Amino acid sequence: MTIMRKKHPLLKLVNHSLIDLPAPSNISSWWNFGSLLGICLMIQILTGLFLAMHYTSDTTTAFSSVAHICRDVNYGWLIRYIHANGASMFFICLFIHVGRGIYYGSYMLLETWNIGIILFLTTMATAFVSYVLPWGQMSFWGATVITNLLSAIPYIGNTLVEWIWGGFSVDKATLTRFFAFHFILPFIITALVLVHLLFLHETGSNNPSGLNSNSDKIPFHPYYTIKDLLGILILLMVLMILVLFFPDVLGDPDNYTPANPLNTPAHIKPEWYFLFAYAILRSIPNKLGGVLALILSILILALFPLLNSSKQCGLIYRPISQSLFWIFIANLFILTWIGGQPVEYPFTTIGQISSILYFTIVLVLMPTASMIENKILKFY
């Protein structure tokens, strides 16, 4: 068997990626989230496939087909809730994975980091086009409001919105194409994941110390396969507790009402994992400015390698930058909370302050802190 996995053309690829891969001996549990994301992706593709067998992308039957899945299909309710809450688990793992990359300086592996940003954007696009599919009140109005933001683009905005909608409002054409996009995008994500891993295995993984670990590597199997299996077990436990005890805690009650274009919900909001970006969008009174801030709130990740002036990799030995990082995380939680609140005082003011702080920490304070730390440690 050993000879076969090292010689066979296909098994050799698996061997170099999962078995004999040299990995740093000191990587912590924060490095588990890559494998957890892979498991989440597999869960989403499998449950999504079974849901697609029973779902109909037509405005007259979409809502009833979801009800039919939950009531009449064997374990349809379970598949649906695993898919819905699996998306939340996916984004929790994704945010932690990106946060770990920022904390430990993994953004210095440029190709891996940039492919990761493309993956993040593609995952967000996949989650967004899925929101309209149940054809509930919030999903309909959420899709209408967010797609309508493209009308802020000068000259071509209105035409672009009508082109995406396939008409003059979110209707059958929009639902059909969004379902098609939602079906194909996870497979594109899978292909991008392979590219992400390809670039990662070219350079080797980063580690908590931020130092070169070539002199101290261990094989991925059995050490990290066992560690990843424990992570997967915990993930599945949390997911099943969510699915079986609190299936609707992260959803919106308005989605249990069929979409009605004549009746607008009191507070239109997207899914919880988009709320931080939605809060940034709402905090700018100008429509185009808000859309640009929304896009920049994600694309700012691409600036981390450019803005990094520290002589050390990661924040583990940099107390000033460490404090700023945790303020940044706390600020993200505040933005997520604000995104779910109505547009009124004091929420608008808190949102504006948090949005300014979000960009200030990344663009001004963290580079300044790096330079101060270089001076203190005499790293000229």
Curated annotation (Swiss-Prot):
Its cofactor is heme b. Disulfide bonds: none annotated. Keywords: Electron transport, Heme, Iron, Membrane, Metal-binding, Mitochondrion, Mitochondrion inner membrane, Respiratory chain, Transmembrane, Transmembrane helix, Transport, Ubiquinone. Pfam families: Cytochrom_B_C (PF00032), Cytochrome_B (PF00033). GO terms for biological process: mitochondrial electron transport, ubiquinol to cytochrome c. It is found in: Mitochondrion inner membrane. Heme b b562 binds at H83, H182. Heme b b566 binds at H97, H196. One of its GO terms (molecular function) is ubiquinol-cytochrome-c reductase activity. It is a multi-pass membrane protein. SUPFAM superfamilies: a domain/subunit of cytochrome bc1 complex (Ubiquinol-cytochrome c reductase), Transmembrane di-heme cytochromes. It comes from the Eukaryota. The chain crosses the membrane at residues 33-53, 77-98, 113-133, 178-198, 226-246, 288-308, 320-340, 347-367. GO terms for cellular component: mitochondrial inner membrane; respiratory chain complex III. Binds 2 heme b groups non-covalently. Component of the ubiquinol-cytochrome c reductase complex (complex III or cytochrome b-c1 complex) that is part of the mitochondrial respiratory chain. The b-c1 complex mediates electron transfer from ubiquinol to cytochrome c. Contributes to the generation of a proton gradient across the mitochondrial membrane that is then used for ATP synthesis. Belongs to the cytochrome b family. Heme 1 (or BL or b562) is low-potential and absorbs at about 562 nm, and heme 2 (or BH or b566) is high-potential and absorbs at about 566 nm. PANTHER family: CYTOCHROME B. The cytochrome bc1 complex contains 11 subunits: 3 respiratory subunits (MT-CYB, CYC1 and UQCRFS1), 2 core proteins (UQCRC1 and UQCRC2) and 6 low-molecular weight proteins (UQCRH/QCR6, UQCRB/QCR7, UQCRQ/QCR8, UQCR10/QCR9, UQCR11/QCR10 and a cleavage product of UQCRFS1). This cytochrome bc1 complex then forms a dimer. This is Cytochrome b. It comes from Thomasomys oreas.
